[in-house]
């Protein structure tokens, strides 16, 4: 970690931290609320399926729109207008200044997330809603990809000194706290899908052995 003087940013925030958290939290809540409501009209069989569907909808939209905005708006940190999407990234860069400098590592990770993982996450939500045969395999694959991206994110920072935060608070709240969500949740979903796939394979093997007899 470092003091604020080592963070190479010269932008001006147009929203307070509290206001940004309030608006961002409201946006995320609405996405989850709408996703939960829609999931009740789908073939998602259990409450856990509905929770997972909400995750895929949420993470998919974040990848496509929020992270996509960062990737495809190179001058966002020069934007001095009250642009909510730009302000979100200005705020997050307090925890990881690599975003403000568009460091190659984070730009690469975010590019893959917005272009590849975003659409695949939304497809995973659709597959779960429609109970598609590729449902668990897709969820497992995307979760592993998210874990891989998260590992690259943390490891690249560690190898470069891990000193990109403006204060210990932003280091733990933003860099560690927020980013860890994409370690914990994908890991849990990957484990769940692995068990589901194994159970299906076991039943199929048992069925095949019964036929042979």
From Swiss-Prot:
It comes from the Eukaryota. It is an enzyme of class 5 (isomerase). GO terms for biological process: sterol biosynthetic process. GO terms for cellular component: endoplasmic reticulum; membrane. Its main location: membrane. It catalyses: 7,8-epoxymelianol = isomeliandiol. Residues 48-190 form the EXPERA domain. The keyword Membrane applies. InterPro entries: EBP, EXPERA. It is found in: Membrane. Its EC number is 5.3.3.-. It is a multi-pass membrane protein. Pathway: Secondary metabolite biosynthesis; terpenoid biosynthesis. Keywords: Isomerase, Lipid biosynthesis, Lipid metabolism, Membrane, Steroid biosynthesis, Steroid metabolism, Sterol biosynthesis, Sterol metabolism, Transmembrane, Transmembrane helix. The chain crosses the membrane at residues 18-38, 52-72, 109-129, 137-157, 171-191. Mainly expressed in petioles. Belongs to the EBP family. Isomerase involved in the biosynthesis of limonoids triterpene natural products such as azadirachtin, an antifeedant widely used as bioinsecticide, and possessing many medicinal applications including anti-tumoral, anti-malarial, anti-rheumatic, antibacterial, anti-inflammatory, anti-pyretic and diuretic effects. Catalyzes the conversion of 7,8-epoxymelianol to isomeliandiol via skeletal rearrangements. This is Isomeliandiol synthase MOI2.
């Amino acid at each position: 970690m470092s003091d604020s003087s080592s963070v190479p940013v010269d932008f001006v925030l147009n929203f307070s931290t509290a206001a940004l958290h309030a608006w961002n939290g409201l946006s995320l809540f609405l996405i989850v609320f709408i996703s939960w409501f829609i999931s009740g009209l789908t073939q998602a069989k259990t409450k856990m399926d509905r929770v997972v569907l909400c995750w895929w909808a949420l993470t998919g939209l974040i990848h496509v729109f929020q992270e996509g905005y960062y990737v495809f708006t190179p001058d966002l940190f020069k934007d001095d207008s009250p642009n909510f999407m730009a302000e979100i990234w200005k705020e997050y860069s307090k925890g990881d200044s690599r975003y403000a400098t568009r460091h190659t590592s984070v730009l690469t990770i975010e590019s893959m997330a917005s272009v590849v993982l975003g659409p695949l996450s939304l497809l995973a939500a659709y597959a779960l809603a429609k109970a598609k045969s590729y449902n668990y395999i897709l969820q497992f694959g995307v979760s592993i990809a998210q874990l891989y991206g998260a590992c690259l994110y943390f490891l690249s920072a560690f190898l470069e000194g891990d000193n990109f935060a403006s204060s210990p608070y932003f280091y733990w709240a933003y860099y560690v706290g927020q980013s860890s969500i994409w370690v914990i949740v994908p890991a849990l979903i990957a484990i769940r899908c692995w068990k589901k796939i194994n159970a299906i394979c076991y039943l199929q093997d048992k069925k095949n052995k019964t036929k042979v007899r």
